[in-house]
C-alpha cells in the first residue's frame, strides 16, 4: 500500500501554507514531517485523510488495502476523547474486538497504574495524548497519522510514547508531524518550509 502525495499546494487567507509538496508513504515507512508552527503540517495530514481538499495537486491511494475501506489510525492536535468515559473506555470504543480490560492492559504500557480507570477529564494533558496514541495504534489501520502527538509531554513521557509506537509499527506506515528537534529517532524526516 502506498499513499502518493503529488505537488500538493494549499493556501489559507491568501497565504501559501503548502507549496508543491510531494511525498511517498509506502508500507513500513516512518516519516517525521518537520516544520515550524503554521508551516502546513496539519493541513498536509488533513489533506491525506481527506478532511480538506488541496488547492492544487493530488493524493493517490495505490495498491491493496488490508481492510474493506481505507482505515486511518489518527492522533489529532485536539484530543477528540469522549468526556465522562474512562481512558480504557475511550480506547475500547474504537475497536469492537478490544475489551475494556484489554484496553486497560494496553494503557498500562504508558500510563501510571490505576490511571486507565479515571475519566479522561481527570488526566493530565500529556496523559490524554498517550490515550490518543494508544487509541490510534489499537485500531486496525492501513496508515497511522499523528499530528504533534508528543505535545505537552515531558522527555520521559515522550521517550516512552516513542518506544510504544516503535513496538507496534509492523508494516503499517506512520506519519507524524512535529516541530524542529522533535522528530522520531527512526525513519526518515521530511522538512516543510
What are these regions (language model features)?
Residues 3, 18-20:
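Conserved structural motif at the start of ABC-family nucleotide-binding domains
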Residues 85-102:
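Q-loop/switch helix immediately C-terminal to the Walker
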Residues 57-68:
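Conserved ABC transporter NBD signature motif
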Residues 119-123, 127:
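Conserved ABC ATPase signature
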Residues 49:
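Helix-to-loop junction immediately C-terminal to a conserved catalytic motif
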Residues 100-115:
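Conserved ABC ATPase "signature" region
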Residues 133:
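Hydrophobic anchor residue at the start of the ABC signature
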